[in-house]
């Protein structure tokens, strides 16, 4: 899937590919309920309906025990399930916030939740707060990891099984 033009960031098909997934995907049937893992408030509820985009997307703001802000993104939702969400709306842990969308409304993907965490919102001219890359270029791993940490623990998952091992040149 990362061979599609939407994931090309460089001048040719052999460089500059966004092939490193930056979130966790949880596969379930379309229509499955999506629940908030933590308290927070809505920053954006959008329909990014381009092919291979998020479809329905929900960005929420949170803060850790020290008051440091961070953000979470739910992608590939049914846009109708988040239509009533308003910016600033409080959401409590355990509350149903959306349902998964079918491929026809979720960017063309098999139904699943894309869950991602970020330490800051996009702030580049021409972007919006919901304009998160779901995949990054492996050459930018350190940068991507600093902005988009592994969200496994927020879902009650151990982070270790979700990190790919480094493959040596000899093995390749």
Pin down the residues of each PLM region.
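Zn2+-dependent peptidoglycan hydrolase active-site motif and core
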Residues: 36-81
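Short, glycine/small-residue-enriched coil/turn segments at secondary-structure junctions
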Residues: 14-51
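Residue-level recognition of short, solvent-exposed, well-ordered loop/turn junctions
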Residues: 29, 35, 86-92
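Histidine-centered active-site/metal-ligand motif
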Residues: 21, 62, 76, 112-114
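Extended, compositionally biased flexible segments
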Residues: 1-19
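Short beta-strand micro-motifs in enzyme catalytic cores
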Residues: 24, 56-58, 111-113
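Acidic, glycine-rich catalytic/binding loops that coordinate metals and/or anionic ligands
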Residues: 83, 89-105, 109-172
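Short alpha-helix capping/helix-loop boundary micro-motifs
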Residues: 27-29, 77-85
């Amino acid at each position: 899937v990362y061979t599609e033009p939407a994931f090309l960031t460089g001048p040719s098909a052999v460089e500059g590919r966004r092939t490193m997934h930056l979130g966790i995907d949880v596969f379930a049937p379309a229509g499955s309920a999506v629940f908030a893992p933590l308290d927070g408030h809505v920053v954006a509820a959008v329909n990014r309906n381009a092919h291979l985009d998020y479809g329905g997307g929900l960005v929420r703001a949170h803060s850790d025990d020290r008051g440091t802000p961070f953000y979470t993104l739910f992608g590939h939702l049914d846009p109708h399930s988040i239509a009533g969400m308003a910016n600033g709306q409080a959401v409590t842990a355990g509350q149903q916030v959306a349902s998964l969308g079918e491929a026809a409304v979720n960017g063309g993907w098999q139904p699943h939740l894309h869950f991602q965490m970020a330490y800051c919102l996009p702030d580049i001219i021409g972007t919006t707060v919901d304009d998160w890359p779901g995949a990054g270029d492996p050459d930018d791993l350190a940068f991507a990891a600093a902005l988009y940490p592994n969200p496994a623990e927020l879902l009650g998952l151990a982070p270790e099984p979700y990190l790919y091992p480094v493959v040596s040149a000899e093995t390749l």
